From Swiss-Prot:
Transmembrane segments: none annotated. One of its GO terms (cellular component) is cytoplasm. This is Orotate phosphoribosyltransferase. Its EC number is 2.4.2.10. Orotate binds at F34, F35, T128, R156. Keywords: Glycosyltransferase, Magnesium, Pyrimidine biosynthesis, Transferase. The gene is pyrE. Its cofactor is Mg(2+).
């Protein structure tokens, strides 16, 4: 586990974005942990979040020209990641996001920011069913741009309805790499370092046995 990944887990725990217990997911599964990125909701939270996203992007080595944040949750993520790349990595890159409702006055259209072109890195909080990615792909392809990759905060590494995860489906369908700041693997490695969290470790491991990919 890299230092920024450990720091991200601690940041998520401190903000109660990451919680352990028993949670019922939309899929009906009972999960021993829950991740709600909406609780990163202050200026300082966003500044830190952008640094973690930027770190993961640089670490991945994937080449891209522009950041795209799908409405709505992807918008602040794309913005703060663009700021962090410029401030901490000397990479001043354009960013763009979509509107859910097309505008027919002013500048019009359903895209805001830089022109959507070149190799696009899509940033979002999580991928649950991959629906947001599919909608974004339509927008990206309509502009003649290419999807270079997708970056999310957490990869739960669990099966969807079939034998593979929603993330693996996205990789298969669009031929792109999906990367994340952390995966379930790092989460388990973190729990293994913390004797006081042993009760959670057992339940997370059992969940991975049942639903992991």
């Amino acid at each position: 586990m890299k230092p920024y990944q450990r720091q991200f887990i601690e940041f998520a725990l401190s903000k109660q974005v990451l919680k352990f217990g028993e949670f019922t997911l939309k899929s009906g599964r009972k999960s021993p942990y829950f991740f709600n990125a909406g609780l990163f909701n202050t200026g300082r939270d966003l500044a830190l979040l952008g640094r973690f996203y930027a770190e993961a992007l640089v670490d991945s080595g994937i080449e891209f020209d522009l950041l795209f944040g799908p409405a709505y949750k992807g918008i602040p993520i794309a913005t703060t990641t663009a700021v962090a790349l410029a401030e901490h990595h000397d990479r001043d890159l354009p960013y763009c996001f979509n509107r859910k409702e097309a505008k027919n006055h002013g500048e019009g259209g359903n895209l805001v920011g830089s022109p959507l072109q070149g190799r696009v890195m899509l940033v979002d909080d999580v991928i649950t069913a991959g629906t947001a990615i599919r909608e974004s792909m339509e927008i990206i392809q309509a502009q003649g741009a290419l999807l270079a990759g997708v970056l999310i905060s957490l990869d739960r590494q669990e099966r969807g309805r079939g034998e593979i995860s929603a993330i693996q489906e996205v990789e298969r369908d669009y031929g792109c790499q999906v990367i994340s700041i952390i995966t379930l693997k790092e989460l388990i490695a973190y729990l293994e370092e913390k004797p006081e969290m042993a009760e959670h470790l057992a339940s997370v491991r059992a969940y991975r046995e049942a639903y992991g990919v």
